[in-house]
Amino acid sequence: MDPALRSYHQRLRLYTPIARGVNLAARSPPLVREARAVVTPRPPIRPSSGKASSDDADVGDELIAIADARGDPPETLPPGAGGAAPACRRPPRGGSPAAFPVALHAVDAPSQFVTWLAVRWLRGAVGLGAVLCGIAFYVTSIARGA
């Protein structure tokens, strides 16, 4: 099982009050002691209507037990990966830098800068226009009899 998912299930198990009063926190310590999340216990859920009853209180524990019994999912790679090292990994120390070419993309920096300036100016103009409209509305309110 994924460690983050397992940690979520552990917290769910530790901080979910059970209607029958079983203290699961005493039986199962948290998996990751270094990075414990600050979680406060929530009030018990009392089923108000429908098919829910106190017999359904252990459904979460059953799901966690099934997940524990199945174990970790197999590592599956996307098609075409073929076990090759990902591009984000550092090259090996003995490897030559020519084996990892630097991706040089053409960036049209001046047009991006001009676009950024135009958008910023437009936002400022729209904001200033809104303020001036508000002032004009306030100033003319007496003449309109408002």
UniProtKB/Swiss-Prot annotation:
Subcellular localization: Host nucleus, Host nucleolus
UniProt cross-references to InterPro entries, sorted A to Z: Herpes_US8A (IPR017377)
Comp. bias (Low complexity): 84-93
UniProt region (Disordered), positions on chain: 63-93
UniProtKB keywords: Host nucleus, Phosphoprotein
Cellular component GO terms, alphabetical: host cell nucleolus
Mod. after translation: Phosphorylated.
Family as reported in the entry's similarity comment: Belongs to the HHV-1 US8.5 protein family.
This protein's name: Protein US8.5
Origin species: Human herpesvirus 2 (strain HG52)
